[in-house]
Amino acid sequence: MTGSARLVLALLLCAGAGPARARAQEADAPLDGPRRIFQDSLLEHLTGDWSMAGRVRGRPVTYTLHAEWVLNHQFLELRMRDVAEPPAYQAMVYLGYDNTSERYVTHWLDAFGGRWSETLGYGQRAGAAVRLVFEYPDGPFHTTFTWNPKDRTWTVLMEDRGPGGVWQEFASYTLHHK
C-alpha cells in the first residue's frame, strides 16, 4: 500500500470514528436524568393559560390554569386556582415521565394538605389522552386529561369509587385557551 493510500485509509477511519463514538455515547446515556429532556407532543398542547369550568361533586366551579415546562423541562407544572376570592381550591401539579418504567408520574399538591399529597399518580397515554391512577389512602382515584384537537380544548375527568365499588364521576372540567 502506498503512502497516499495509507493516508486516505487513515482519514476515512478517523471520519467514521466520530459518528460511531457519538452513537455509542447515545446508547450509554441513561434513560432518565438531567440530560434526558422530557418531550411530549400531546402535553405541549396544554402549555399556556386556560379557563377551566366544570363540576366537582355536581357543584359548578371555575378555575384558572397556567401550564409551563419547569425543572429543566422534566415536568409540566399546572397551577390551578379557583377564581373566587379567597380561592376555595388551589393546586400545583407536576406531570413528568419515567422513561425507565415507561409511564407518566404525577405529583399533585393541593389545598387539602400533605395526607393526600403523599401519593404519586402513575399513568399511560392512549391516543390523545393521559390516564393517571392515584392509590390514595382512602381508595383509588383516576384523572384523565384528553386533548380535543378539533376545537383545541382539553377535558379533565376525575373518578373515584362510590358505594359498592362502582366508579363515579368526582369532577369534570373543560379547558379553553385564554
Please place each PLM-identified region on the residue numbering.
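Bacterial N-terminal signal peptides that target proteins for export
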Residues: 1-8
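Residue-identity detector for glycine
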Residues: 3, 16-18
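Basic polycationic patches enriched in arginine
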Residues: 6, 21-23
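Bacterial N-terminal signal peptides
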Residues: 8-16
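Hydrophobic small-molecule pocket/channel-lining residues, especially in calycin-type beta-barrels
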Residues: 23-178
